[in-house]
């Protein structure tokens, strides 16, 4: 997501159309109806679903969270404008891998250019009171991430390659 228009699209897509007199009308909802399955999954009536199936923080009762990813220099350059002009963004998640690649330092998360870019994203988010997300929180960096002010934390799933390793061994490709 690199500009105002591309960032407004997911918010519009998550919202049902509302009367123009409704509070927080913009961005206008583009979502189709069909609430039956979703209401059943949520364990609520259709009318309750309509009330809850809106974007937080636009609708304080909304239970949908729109997270945009900031993973290239162009996005950083436009981030302040995006956060000023696009209501409803709940979190800005830094795409560390793609960002480091875009800067020319693939997976070198400690490179000064990558650190500087991530700091700029956090600062802009803080200025606009939008939580900034860190995608790679682990025991060794948890305290640093919290101290730096990240408010949305993600951890990688535990992965096991036992079957792959066994197959490689069986095929002599270890």
Map each language-model feature to its residues.
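Conserved functional loop/turn residues at catalytic and ligand-binding sites
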Residues: 149
């Amino acid at each position: 997501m690199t500009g105002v228009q591309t960032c407004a699209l997911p918010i519009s897509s998550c919202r049902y159309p509302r009367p123009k007199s409704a509070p927080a009308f913009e961005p206008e909802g583009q979502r189709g109806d069909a609430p039956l399955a979703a209401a059943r999954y949520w364990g609520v009536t259709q009318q309750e679903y309509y009330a809850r199936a809106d974007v937080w923080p636009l609708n304080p009762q909304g239970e949908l969270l729109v997270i945009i990813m900031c993973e290239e220099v162009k996005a950083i350059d436009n981030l302040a404008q995006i956060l000023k002009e696009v209501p409803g963004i709940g979190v800005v998640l830094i795409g560390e891998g793609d960002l480091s690649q875009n800067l020319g330092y693939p997976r070198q998360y400690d490179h000064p250019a990558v650190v500087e870019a991530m700091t700029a994203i956090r600062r802009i988010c803080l200025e606009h009171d939008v939580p900034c997300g860190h995608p790679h929180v682990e025991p060794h960096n948890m305290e640093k991430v919290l101290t730096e002010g990240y408010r949305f934390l993600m951890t990688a799933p535990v992965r096991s390659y036992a079957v792959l390793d066994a197959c490689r061994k069986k095929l002599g490709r270890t």
